């Protein structure tokens, strides 16, 4: 998927809690200059990086990826890691984009206010459903709680509706399968 996005012209791909579910990623993550994994995974044992710098239209941009810990995997404190990485990035550029891959809206909002005025934007990911709360915080940081997913439109968060409904109706464990056919949706946000 990463290689396909690069061929289509993506500037960067950020990851989240499923970053290492597919073993193929270990073959190329350390050599991929535009692939960013959550920086608060254990640094000593996790391949890849959580901070990269890009030059886009003669503008230097830092991209930081962190994963929340509320209702998710217990990782290094994302707020403390954010503090370190933002200070590091600010030595190179004032243009800093943060992808905060987290479950709860409150943790995403807390991160945005924590970094307000120190980063250009905090955009949440993970829940697959775009929120309708794009705004600029008092310190000038652009914020969107969740950008949503890129995937099948006629699905439940990208999975076959029948599988998800079966789990909710029967309360039995059900394997979710990706909805692979039909029209797609591209969720996005534009930040000037």
Task: Place the predicted regions along the sequence by residue.
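Acidic, metal/ion-coordinating pockets
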Residues: 1-192
């Amino acid at each position: 998927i990463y290689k396909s996005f690069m061929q289509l012209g993506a500037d960067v791909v950020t990851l989240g809690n499923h970053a290492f579910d597919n073993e193929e990623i270990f073959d190329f993550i350390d050599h991929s200059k535009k692939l960013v994994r959550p920086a608060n995974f254990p640094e000593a044992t996790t391949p890849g990086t959580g901070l990269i710098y890009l030059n886009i239209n003669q503008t230097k941009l830092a991209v930081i990826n962190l994963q929340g810990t509320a209702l998710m995997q217990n990782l290094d404190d994302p707020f403390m890691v954010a503090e370190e990485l933002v200070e590091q990035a600010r030595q190179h550029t004032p243009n800093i984009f943060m992808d905060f891959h987290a479950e709860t809206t409150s943790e995403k909002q807390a991160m945005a206010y924590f970094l307000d005025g120190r980063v250009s934007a905090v955009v949440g990911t993970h829940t697959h459903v775009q929120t309708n709360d794009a705004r600029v915080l008092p310190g000038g940081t652009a914020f969107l709680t969740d950008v949503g997913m890129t995937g099948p439109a006629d699905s439940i968060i990208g999975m076959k509706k029948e599988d998800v409904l079966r789990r909710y109706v029967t309360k039995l464990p059900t394997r979710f399968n990706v909805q692979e056919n039909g029209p797609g949706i591209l969720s996005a946000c534009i930040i000037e």
